[in-house]
Swiss-Prot record:
Main location: membrane
Protein's name in the database: Purine ribonucleoside efflux pump NepI
NCBIfam families: PRK10213.1
UniProt-listed GO biological process terms: transmembrane transport
GO terms, molecular function: antiporter activity; purine nucleoside transmembrane transporter activity; transmembrane transporter activity
Gene for this chain: nepI
Domain of life: Bacteria
């Protein structure tokens, strides 16, 4: 029955893709991600200017992630039938306001308030991203549109820290956030001009968010999402000590490795739509299986710099399929409740990132250098098995 509802929901979709709106959404996402990670490269001048320690200043990143998790969970309950066009415009305005509040912050409290505004926009936008995408393009084009959005994310992740560091040294950290506010204004203008009216959820489709987990294969899917992202952060959070101590990379070498990873991630995201068109389930099971094998290879032969560098590239290519693949799964199998499913997905990912990094750090401190790799590889292997055995993918109509 649920599959029939999803089929009807997709049948009512758009006939032609609205690429201007898709790129507007992608630009907003890229700006949100860039601003989220700007403090990483500006912590020292921010801390000095505000008279706080770098550790305290780092909480400006933590509070954004914390607020984003709750925003993603409850945004669809709050906005209900409100036109999603106005909600996206509001998120773009919040992005701009956040940048200005941080730029003019004269206290740690105002800094946190500005970053909390960013968290509201970030979590809400991510929760709605899959449902927005499937309402802007025909069903057959959804994987391609999602790859555009996640491609923008990859670019933002690659350029955010180095761009912030470079500009901060020239114009100062406050003007970096002023420049980000200008990007926020551009987001508002682009969204206003390109995004069509997107009515909220009709009353007959209202359903408790967590009742979605009772649908066949959905709980398994969320568990697989948790394990794949926890596995990613269990390893990637500690890539610096692993690569510098295991493979013997210096700082410059590690920078090149991370740049290669970022480029590979962008390439993988760009081509993900072609893989997902052929088989979503194969991508969702095959990518973590390849990552599990990569972790094993790094454990056995990671002392070789060539092998370690190659694994970073393979990792970037393979993991790029994971976020696009799971968003595609939502648009296929939970099309009638895509917003609520997206809310749960984002909250699960935020929790997985936190747990993966925490457990990976504990393993590194107590069980040695290879333990985050072993943990990551084990989680990725379990993900592949759960997807293959339990996750259901609704065929594209």
């Amino acid at each position: 029955m649920n599959e029939n509802i999803a089929e009807k929901f997709r049948a009512d979709g758009v006939a032609r893709p609205n690429w201007s709106a898709v790129f507007a959404v992608a630009f907003c996402v890229a700006c949100l991600i860039t601003v989220e990670f700007l403090p990483v490269s500006l912590l020292t001048p921010m801390a000095q200017d505000l008279g706080i320690s770098e550790g305290v200043a780092g909480q400006s990143v933590t509070v954004t992630a914390f607020v984003a998790m709750f925003s993603s969970l409850f945004i669809t309950q709050i906005i209900q039938a409100t036109d999603r066009r106005y909600i996206v415009i509001l998120f773009a305005v919040l992005l701009t306001a956040s940048c200005l509040m941080v730029s003019f912050a004269n206290s740690f409290t105002l800094l946190l308030l500005g970053r909390a505004c960013l968290g509201l926009a970030l979590g809400g936008f991510w929760a709605m991203s899959a449902s927005l995408t499937m309402r802007l393009v025909p069903a057959r084009t959804v994987p391609k549109a999602l790859s555009v959005i996640f491609g923008a994310v990859s670019i933002a992740l690659v350029i955010a820290a180095p761009l912030g560091s470079f500009l901060g040294g020239i114009i100062g950290w406050r003007n970096v956030f002023n420049a980000a506010a200008v990007m926020g204004v551009l987001c508002v203008i682009w969204v206003v001009k390109s995004l069509p009216s997107l009515p909220g959820e009709p009353s007959h489709q209202k359903q408790n968010m967590f009742s979605l987990l009772q649908r066949p294969g959905v709980m398994a899917g969320m568990i697989a999402i948790f394990m794949s992202f926890a596995g990613q952060f269990a390893f990637f959070t500690y890539i610096r000590p692993v690569y510098m101590n295991l493979a013997g990379f210096d700082v410059d070498g590690l920078t090149l490795v991370l740049l290669s990873f970022g480029i590979a991630s962008f390439v993988g995201t760009s081509f993900s739509s072609y893989v997902l068109k052929r088989s979503v389930k194969l991508a969702l099971a095959g990518a973590p299986l390849l990552l599990a094998l990569s972790a094993l290879t790094l454990i056995v032969w990671g002392s070789d710099k060539t092998v370690a560098a190659a694994i970073a590239i393979i990792w970037g290519l393979a993991f790029a399929l994971v976020p696009v693949g799971w968003s595609t799964w939502i648009t296929r199998s939970l099309a009638d409740q895509a917003e609520k499913a997206g809310s749960i997905q984002v909250a699960v990912i935020q929790l997985a990132n936190t747990c993966g990094a925490a457990v990976g750090g504990y393993a590194l401190d107590n069980f040695g250098l290879l333990s985050p790799l072993a943990l990551s590889g084990g989680l990725m292997l379990l993900t592949a098995l759960v997807v293959a055995a339990k996750v259901r993918i609704t065929p594209m109509s």
